[in-house]
Regions:
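Conserved P-loop NTPase nucleotide-binding/switch module
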Residues: 1-86
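NTP-binding/hydrolysis catalytic cores, primarily Walker-type P-loop NTPases
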Residues: 71-131
Length: 131
């Protein structure tokens, strides 16, 4: 998504259309949440709390890819969207890319590692066949 159509996407995701997937551009998973808010506001004037509620109920998982110094793209983080806390969208980092010591400027070597954070919405994701 790139603009005001973001609200249409979120509303479709929130009306029982399981299995939705989209791409967006952000510097991190939390930055992507802010970008989604901004893109909704590009199309309609709406209270930020309502936008955040739409995002938090529509999106289950955020997969963040990044370009590495060797020009490859790697999955850097996998986050679960937990809900709203203190007025902000709360993310739970599940996996993070760990670079290996043998990496150099020409080849980045590493792997995703599971964090110690438990999956919070496990039952919801199991119902959808994702956990």
């Amino acid at each position: 998504v790139r603009g005001g159509e973001t609200l249409d996407m979120l509303q479709a995701m929130n009306t029982g259309h399981d299995g939705s997937m989209s791409t967006g551009h952000g510097n991190s998973p939390s930055d992507m949440m802010t970008r989604l808010e901004t893109m909704v506001l590009m199309g309609i004037d709406m209270p930020l709390a309502a936008i955040r509620a739409q995002i938090a109920t529509a999106i289950d998982i955020v997969i963040h890819l990044g370009r590495m110094r060797d020009k490859t793209r790697k999955v850097l983080e996998i986050n679960e969207v937990v809900g709203i806390r203190n007025g902000q969208i709360e993310l739970n980092r599940l996996y993070v890319f760990k670079e290996e010591p043998e990496s150099d400027k020409n080849k980045v070597v590493g792997q995703l590692e599971r964090t110690e954070n438990p999956l919070i919405n496990k039952q919801k994701l199991e119902r959808k066949g994702l956990a």
